[in-house]
């Protein structure tokens, strides 16, 4: 499994390099394409080593210790021991939208982040189910490719935004000599966000089913995880997340963003109803009925 994740991460980095070189060639020819190649090498390095910090910074997440959040920290520590994992760092996101995600490049450098809203609406059993889900992502090493994909998707959309305005104003300054930059800007504005979302879609939705099963078995409470998923889904529909970056949607236990933006054209998660039904079957296997 580790080798597959490494290969998929390498493919994502190669895709980013190709996209950046293509944008550079479109707006500046071979010289700019080469500069973008060098930049992509630097960005790939930063993404691998620091993507978790990048993602956490998008949500103003704060690392806490066992003295600041004793109950949450104890749950993470105890379930990590049960899963045979080193205890990950714990972060709290200042958002009232209930949700959670895991990030990091490997189990030794992992972080489990939860929102204030999640801590507010879930009971202890439900919280254990959610933490178990995130720990399964860590154990299965989903966090590397998920975090790298989020950082890359965010970078692609941001670079496309900059390139669009640079091309438009640059085109005007050259008296619209051939309109090429304007056409290029339009193409980038349309295609780059789609490329970013396709990168997100490359993160298999089946990973969520596996993480649900793992979370149910680690916590021993599939019914509580099912209840948590329902609560989160209902709360997100009522109060979708406004802060952060849609490029991270696939990282959360439930997609926290709603609406008709490009970020929602590609589904990042299986339907919550299907996940709950699978948890019901897992519960029956464990002799639990709900």
Curated annotation (Swiss-Prot):
Keyword Cytoplasm recorded = no
EC main class here is hydrolase
Q: How does it sit in the membrane?
A: Multi-pass membrane protein
**Localization per Swiss-Prot or TrEMBL:** Cell membrane
Catalytic residues (UniProt): 134
Domain of life here?
Archaea
Q: Name one GO cellular component term.
A: plasma membrane
Q: Which GO terms describe its molecular function?
A: metalloendopeptidase activity; zinc ion binding
EC number of this enzyme: 3.4.24.-
The membrane spanning regions, by residue number, are 5-27, 32-51, 143-163, 182-202
InterPro entries recorded for this chain? HtpX_protease, Pept_M48_protease_HtpX, Peptidase_M48
Task: Give the binding site residues for Zn(2+).
Answer: 133, 137, 208
Name its GO BP terms in alphabetical order.
proteolysis
Cofactor descriptive note: Binds 1 zinc ion per subunit.
Signal peptide stretch: none
Q: Which UniProt keywords apply?
A: Cell membrane, Hydrolase, Membrane, Metal-binding, Metalloprotease, Protease, Transmembrane, Transmembrane helix, Zinc
Cofactor field: Zn(2+)
Asked whether the keyword Membrane is assigned, the reply is yes
Q: Which HAMAP family match?
A: Pept_M48_protease_HtpX
| PANTHER family with a match to the protein in the record | PROTEASE HTPX (PTHR43221), PROTEASE HTPX HOMOLOG (PTHR43221:SF2)
UniProt family annotation: Belongs to the peptidase M48B family.
Q: What is this protein called?
A: Protease HtpX homolog
Q: Which organism is it from?
A: Thermococcus kodakarensis (strain ATCC BAA-918 / JCM 12380 / KOD1) (Pyrococcus kodakaraensis (strain KOD1))
Q: Which gene encodes it?
A: htpX
């Amino acid at each position: 499994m580790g080798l597959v994740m490494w290969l998929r991460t390498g493919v994502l980095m190669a895709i980013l390099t190709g996209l950046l070189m293509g944008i550079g060639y479109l707006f500046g020819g071979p010289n700019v394409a080469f500069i973008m190649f060098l930049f992509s090498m630097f960005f790939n390095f930063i993404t691998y080593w620091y993507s978790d910090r990048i993602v956490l910074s998008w949500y103003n997440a704060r690392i806490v210790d066992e003295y600041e959040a004793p109950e949450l920290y104890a749950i993470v520590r105890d379930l990590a021991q049960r899963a045979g994992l080193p205890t990950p760092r714990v972060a709290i996101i200042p958002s009232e939208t209930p949700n959670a995600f895991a990030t990091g490049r490997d189990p030794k450098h992992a972080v489990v982040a939860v929102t204030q809203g999640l801590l507010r609406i879930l009971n202890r059993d439900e919280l254990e189910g959610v933490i178990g889900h995130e720990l399964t992502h860590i154990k299965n090493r989903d966090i590397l490719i998920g975090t790298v994909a989020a950082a890359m998707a965010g970078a692609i959309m941001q670079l496309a935004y900059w390139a669009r305005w640079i091309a438009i104003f640059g085109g005007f300054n050259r008296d619209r000599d051939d309109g090429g930059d304007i056409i290029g800007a339009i193409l980038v504005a349309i295609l780059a966000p789609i490329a970013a979302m396709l990168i997100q879609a490359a993160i298999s939705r089946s990973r969520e089913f596996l993480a649900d099963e793992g979370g149910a078995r680690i916590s021993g409470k599939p019914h509580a995880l099912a209840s948590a998923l329902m609560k989160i889904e209902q709360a997100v529909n009522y109060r979708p997340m406004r802060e952060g970056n849609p490029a991270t949607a696939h990282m959360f236990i439930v997609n926290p963003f709603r609406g008709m933006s490009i970020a929602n054209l590609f589904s990042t998660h299986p339907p919550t109803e299907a996940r709950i039904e699978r948890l019901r079957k897992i519960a029956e296997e464990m002799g639990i009925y709900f």
